[in-house]
Amino acid sequence: MPSKRRNNGRNKKNKGHADTVRCTNCGRVVSKDKAIKRFQQRNMVDASSKRDIQENYAYAQSDFTMPKIYVKLSYCVSCAIHARIVRVRSVEDRRHRYTTKLRQHVRPEAQTGNASLPLALLPKI
């Protein structure tokens, strides 16, 4: 029977057994290499509360930075599809690997894929 994906939906190569993690959404036990992992960083308080805290802070505002919450989320495949963290892709598109964020030091012409065009002729994003 033909394989649906090159990696069979897992990141495990020649390891034998992979550890398990719990899905953040439903609690299902899923292998660590198969789980869809996302790293989330957010402010501890919302924007309006943050503004109030900074205005009423006793010390210099330049010395104070609000702490952030850093959470590593891991989802099972069904929850990741349901929450639209990953989407169902066609057979050709499954072969393409991509990252969710572009790096900051990439030039604008490289982001659009028109590296041969000069910067002035590029469409405005």
UniProtKB/Swiss-Prot annotation:
GO MF, one example: mRNA binding
Entry keyword annotation includes Ribonucleoprotein: yes
Membrane-spanning parts: none
The organism's place on the tree of life at top rank: Eukaryota
GO cellular component, one term: cytosolic small ribosomal subunit
UniProt record similarity statement: Belongs to the eukaryotic ribosomal protein eS26 family.
Name this protein carries in UniProt: Small ribosomal subunit protein eS26
